[in-house]
Amino acid sequence: MSLPIAGLAQLSKGIIQVVGKDATKFLNGLITSRMLPNVVKKKQHTISENENRHANLSEIIDINNNWGLMHGDIYDPEENIFIGRDGLNSMFLNSKGRVTADCFLYSFPFHNSKGSFEEVLKKPNFLIEVDSRIIPEMESLLRIHKLSAKVKINTVSDIYSYYYYSDTMEFDELLEQVQDTYFRSVDPNEALVKANEFIESNLIFNSRVSSNIVGFSIDNRIPNLGIKILTNKPLNNDDQNIGVAVDDFFSESFQQSFRTNIISEDVINMRRNVNGLFEGQDADIDQTLLPFECNLDYTNGLSLDKGCYVGQELTIRTYNNGVIRKRIMPVQFFENNEETVDEISNQGYVNIDSSDKVVETLKMLNQTTLGKLDMLPLYDLPVENEESKSASPFASSPFGGESKKSRRRKASSGKIISQHDNVGFALVTLSEIERNDLFKIEVPSLEGGMRSVGIKVFTPDWWPEQEDY
């Protein structure tokens, strides 16, 4: 099965607005991304030369104004920090350092072309985009932490979330051009000017519908994966009378170069799965995960020098100790037979196939049941007893027989987080992947007894170069 080369999909996301004088400081204490301009280190001498370049950020950024967002990457050797109106990836954690929700955070409004949002720009204003299933819980969480902070928190029902991608070299080059030209600002005033220029450039959007674009972000969780768009009206095909027609939304030049057909959200989710980009919505709501297990450090969602926030202690300690034992990785399920094993052993990418026979086998199990099954190495070889290796006279059995080879009970190598058709995500022990990428689970068979289903784990090619597991 091949995915469409390009398309636009509406996402099942909900939006919460946080607005007010203390909005920046309030959110800085709750999310994993840096919001405040000052560098926080326990010891002054640990501030690097690159970080010193940004020492005057507190003079440039007035957090009491609608200033935008700071963008950084912990894997950037130059430790660049840019200020922009575009959105960023982040997470909310609980006090134990476990993920409450992943999110995209947007500076609202994205632009003020033609003075469309003059009134909104008068105070700090942010939009939080999360899985629509958890909107009530997220709004409650924000209100619990509000205390005396001067902010207003509201769920917004008339803002719509969209995702566009095009798997072409030309689109990748366009996004590079857009980022280099419009999203490399170093102060808030320039950031707003550049956002206005981008909207008016017609590179992607038709400037005539600028008043309908309230949020924008290049999705750099994986470099140039796509773009995220927030609108105040729904987008639709020409034959519908509500909202904005897609043909009117994108510029004429953009439509001449790229397809802009509407696709389903399922396509976006499957494309994420193929590329190994996990989101919280992929797992059961009650699933508890750590931010590093969700690869937050790989997807530009973590700051290491932002100071205190909920869940910080375990997160920073884990990073500094360098002990990350498990990560969520893309997997493909397959029929466990000799022919299929030989074929998939040499397969270097996730291949979606809804007609695969293994899909019927997996249909018998719900998500919760799958998550409880142990992932074990596909090849479970006999392991010789330690006693038989010893030269000690006590190595032999006291009952006169020779020591026998036994099978050491294998600990689970991981667990299934999600499954759709023949692909999914699994939380995998990294040390296992170094030795082997083929695993199995035992599932009930219609004929009675148990049946083995194979699993291949793929390491995404966009991950930073790995140290030894």
Swiss-Prot record:
Biased composition (Low complexity): 390-401
Cell location: Mitochondrion matrix
Predominant location: mitochondrion
Keywords: Mitochondrion, Transit peptide
Region of interest (Disordered), ranges: 387-415
One Gene Ontology term of the molecular function aspect: transferase activity
InterPro entries reported for this sequence: TrmE/GcvT_dom1, YgfZ/GcvT, YgfZ/GcvT_CS
Organelle targeting sequence: 1-43
GO cellular component labels: mitochondrial matrix
GO biological process: iron-sulfur cluster assembly
Cystines in this chain: none
Family: Belongs to the GcvT family. CAF17/IBA57 subfamily.
Protein name: Iron-sulfur cluster assembly factor IBA57 homolog, mitochondrial
Source organism of the structure: Scheffersomyces stipitis (strain ATCC 58785 / CBS 6054 / NBRC 10063 / NRRL Y-11545) (Yeast)
